[in-house]
Amino acid sequence: MIEELGKIDRIIQESVPGKQITLAHVIAAPIEAVYECLGVDHEGAIGVVSLTPNETAIIAADIAGKAANIDICFVDRFTGSVMFSGDIQSVETSLEDILEYFKNSLGFSTVPLTKS
């Protein structure tokens, strides 16, 4: 593919993070295969958040844990991903609190909470 572009001396890729939440989603009733693939023991809803700058995933996980009775499944400060599980109301409450804090306290752009 690169040959098709002609001679290229180098390719430069940059990540220029904004202050934003790009995904806030509740999987209300995941199929068993999702739990198995993710390595999640808890049966219930799963919450997923994606943020930039990536390090803010740590803050989101802390807010989620303080907002409701959820289990933190995954926090990746290198990609800005957070995943947690619990009963559906607790997962929704945690996501709502994350969105509210990041928008109103930190001035982030946010997305609507989605659910499947």
From Swiss-Prot:
The organism's taxonomy opens as: Bacteria, Bacillati, Bacillota, Bacilli, Lactobacillales
Domain of life the protein comes from:
Bacteria
Function as written in the Swiss-Prot or TrEMBL entry? A minor shell protein of the choline degradation-specific bacterial microcompartment (BMC). Proteins such as this one with circularly permuted BMC domains may play a key role in conferring heterogeneity and flexibility in this BMC.
Q: Which family does it belong to?
A: Belongs to the EutS/PduU family.
Describe the subunit structure.
Answer: Has been crystallized in 5 structures (all are mutated, 3 have an N-terminal His-tag), most are homohexameric with a central pore. In two the homohexamer lies flat with a beta-barrel on the flat face created by the protruding N termini of the six chains. In 2 others the hexamer is not flat but has a six-fold screw axis; the screw pitch is 33.8 or 41.9 Angstroms depending on the structure. Interacts with the BMC major shell protein.
Question: What keywords would UniProt list here?
Answer: Bacterial microcompartment, Transport
Cellular compartments per GO CC = bacterial microcompartment
**Pathway the protein takes part in:** Amine and polyamine metabolism; choline degradation
Q: Do the record's keywords include Transmembrane?
A: no
What SUPFAM superfamilies does this protein's entry cite? CcmK-like
Subcellular localization is given as: Bacterial microcompartment
The molecule here is called: Bacterial microcompartment shell protein CutR
Gene that this polypeptide is encoded by? cutR
Q: What is its main location?
A: other
Q: Where is the BMC circularly permuted domain?
A: 10-108
Description of its domains: One side of the hexamer is concave and lined by hydrophobic residues, the other side has a slightly protruding, 6-stranded beta-barrel.
